[in-house]
Amino acid sequence: MKDKLEALLDQALSELAQASTEEGVQELRVKYLGKKGELTSVMKGLGALTPEERPIIGQVVNTVKGKLEEGFELRGGEIREAVKSARLSAERIDVTLPGRRRPLGSKHPITLVTEEIASIFGALGFAVAEGPEIELDFYNFEALNLPKDHPARDMQDTFYFGESVLLRTHTSPVQIRTMLKQPPPVRIIAPGTVYRCDSDATHSPMFHQVEGLMVDKGITFGDLKGILTLFISQLFGSDIGVRLRPSFFPFTEPSAEVDIACVICRGKGCRVCKETGWLEILGAGMVDPEVYRHVGYDSELYTGFAFGMGIERIAMLKYGIADMRLLFENDLRFLKQF
């Protein structure tokens, strides 16, 4: 029986050496050490041996079993290590290869235009001022020469929270807050979000404006025209035509609408400019003395001008965008063009 056990060990180790998968090793383990395995069958015959043979053969059986279990563990480990090495080799990273760049986004056209406007006026000495979007009636209307029941309030469809609290309809309240906080000279622009009850292809209930204010001794309408002409030439090009037309705003006197030569036809007349050759881009004027009264400035000593423009309109003209709603739809196919 000893010879039979040694032959069984040699055969098992030989087959084990040929196994190439963990499943194959497991099958051999069952074949030799399972409940119906070959070594188990031999062990069942120990009872037929003489008392003298039984301990000797039992020791041989234990030795064979121990070597088989050790062999199965070793071969299984070798196979697992080989599989791991093969997988690591297949997944090897060549550190000399160029990396993959993460896709980068781009700035929204509204942001681009706002930053460009701020940069142009910043070079002219204007600081950026900010204020709350939820405003009081005083800052949004009354201090801007728009008392209650003034007919000019109908020019702006306003979102009200109550009698005196509202969503600001322009960024002019920032000018009032700034003048109340500091004495002249003042030179600021106020970019920000504003709200009005209006929505179509060229209007949105939420949009963006940049308004500007300059107050000091000796400021004239000529200063207003010079600064706005310089601003327009830097934004749209030095060859663009500029004109000022008389207009009305409750908080400036005199007031003007500022037009530029149509960016599509260059002043020749087309569908975009309604054959006039001109496009309105902003409103401006000399600050009304009544506004100075509300903020405590001496209108006999100081003069100044204010202006305001819609950023969406500037963006539409600058980038040739036909429908304002494209600026708010978050369509990446559109936004990636900027």
UniProtKB/Swiss-Prot annotation:
Asked whether the keyword ATP-binding is assigned, the reply is: yes
Q: Which cofactor does it need?
A: Mg(2+)
E.C. numbers:
6.1.1.20
Where in the cell is the protein located?
A: Cytoplasm
Instruction: Report which reactions are catalysed by this protein.
Output: tRNA(Phe) + L-phenylalanine + ATP = L-phenylalanyl-tRNA(Phe) + AMP + diphosphate + H(+)
The record's remark on the cofactor is: Binds 2 magnesium ions per tetramer.
Q: Which HAMAP family match?
A: Phe_tRNA_synth_alpha1
UniProt name for this protein: Phenylalanine--tRNA ligase alpha subunit
Q: Which organism is it from?
A: Geobacter sp. (strain M21)
Task: Tell me the gene name.
Answer: pheS
